[in-house]
């Protein structure tokens, strides 16, 4: 009888139900979609190779192995969806909404430039999660036009989302 108990406990994961209770069902679905985007090889675990591939797809081709290892080491073990959700839950406890949104964008900006490519942001917003319409994209670019190099200042977008107006320069 004991092996069944141990097996069930291992499969269920201690405390895993707690992390799911921290989020609304819609938030869990959004995190699942983000996890699926990052899990490039679809094996249910985010690896260094998955991170390298997703960053390369965003134009970040020169990410060092040490940087990838540091990202992976933030977890206590293999990063499955429950661990991924737990990591976000821990980071979001008591966090300022603007910081939370900026942190989400920073995942797409490993070099810390404060901006991301317009084409990449548009692709994400029109193909993932709650897809933006052409009209919504037009309105976004009217409100937050990219610079001459095609970069979008995501920190300004985050400020407006959380404060409702642009910062005074």
From Swiss-Prot:
CDD domains to which the protein is assigned, alphabetical: EFh
SUPFAM superfamilies associated with the record: EF-hand (SSF47473)
Subunit composition and interactions: Myosin is a hexamer of 2 heavy chains and 4 light chains. Interacts with nanos3; the interaction negatively regulates mylpfa phosphorylation.
Lineage of the organism: Eukaryota, Metazoa, Chordata, Craniata, Vertebrata
Disruption outcome: Reduced trunk contractile force and complete pectoral fin paralysis. Muscle weakness is most pronounced in an appendicular muscle and is explained by reduced myosin activity and fiber degeneration.
Protein residues bound to Ca(2+): 39, 41, 43, 50
Highest taxon of source: Eukaryota
GO biological process: actin-myosin filament sliding; muscle contraction; muscle tissue morphogenesis; skeletal muscle tissue development
Name of the featured protein: Myosin regulatory light chain 2, skeletal muscle isoform A
Role of this protein: Myosin regulatory subunit that plays a role to maintain muscle integrity during early development. Plays a role in muscle contraction.
Residue positions, PTM Phosphoserine: 21
């Amino acid at each position: 009888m004991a092996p069944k108990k141990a097996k069930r406990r291992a499969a269920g994961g201690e405390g895993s139900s707690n992390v799911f209770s921290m989020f609304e069902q819609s938030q869990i679905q959004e995190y699942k979609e983000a996890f699926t985007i990052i899990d490039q090889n679809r094996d249910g675990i985010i690896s260094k190779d998955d991170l390298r591939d997703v960053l390369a797809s965003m134009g970040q081709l020169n990410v060092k192995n040490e940087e990838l290892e540091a990202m992976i080491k933030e977890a206590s073990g293999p990063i499955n969806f429950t661990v991924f959700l737990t990591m976000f839950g821990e980071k979001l406890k008591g966090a300022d909404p603007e910081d939370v949104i900026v942190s989400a964008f920073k995942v797409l900006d490993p070099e810390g430039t404060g901006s991301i490519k317009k084409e990449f942001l548009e692709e994400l917003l029109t193909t993932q999660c709650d897809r933006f319409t052409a009209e919504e994209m037009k309105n976004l670019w009217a409100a937050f036009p990219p610079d001459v190099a095609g970069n979008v200042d995501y920190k300004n977008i985050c400020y407006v989302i959380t404060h409702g107006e642009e910062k005074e320069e």
